[in-house]
Amino acid sequence: MGDKEGACFMKIAKYLDKALEYLSILALVIMISLVFFNSVLRYFFDSGIAFSEEFSRICFVYMISFGIILVAKDKAHLTVDIIIPALPEQYRKIVLIVANICVLIAMIFIAYGALQLMSLTYTQQMPATGISSSFLYLAAVISAVSYFFIVMFSMIKDYKESSDK
C-alpha cells in the first residue's frame, strides 16, 4: 500500500472513529433521556412512554457494541498481565500471539452464534417498537467482526514491526 492509499485509509479510519464516538454518545443520551422521562411520567402521571424500555435496551446494546470497537482500536481493554511482563521478550511475544489467536477464535464463535440468533429471531418483532428482534443481535455481529479485524490488523502490524527490527 502506497503513501496515498495509506493516508486515505487513515482519513477514513479517523472519520469512522468519530462516527462511532458520536453514535455512542447519542445512544447514551437517548437511553438516559428515555429512562429519566419515563420514570418522571410514571411517578407523576401513572403512565409512561410505551416504547422507552425497548428503545433504551437497543441504545444500550449498540452503545456497548460501539464502545467495544473503540476500546479495541486503542488496545485499552482491561487486561490482567501479572505474568506477561515477567517473561523474557521471546516468550512474551509467543504468549501475546497465542492470546490474540484465542481472541480471534472467540470472535468467530461470537459472530457465528449471533448470526444464528439473528436468523432465529428475524421474524419476531419487539412488541412496543415493532423492530425485528434480530436487530439486537446485529450489534454482536458488528462488534465481533470489527474486533476480529482490529486484532488481525494489529497482529499483522506487530509482525511487520518486529520483522523490520
Swiss-Prot record:
Keyword Cytoplasm listed: no
Similarity annotation: Belongs to the TRAP transporter small permease family.
Membrane topology: Multi-pass membrane protein
InterPro entries: DctQ, TRAP_DctQ
TM spans (from-to): 20-40, 51-71, 94-114, 136-156
Protein location: Cell inner membrane
One Gene Ontology term, aspect cellular component: plasma membrane
UniProt-listed GO biological process terms: C4-dicarboxylate transport
Chief localisation class: membrane
GO MF terms held by the record: transmembrane transporter activity
Keywords assigned: Cell inner membrane, Cell membrane, Membrane, Transmembrane, Transmembrane helix, Transport
Record bears the keyword Membrane: yes
Protein name from the UniProt record: Putative TRAP transporter small permease protein HI_0051
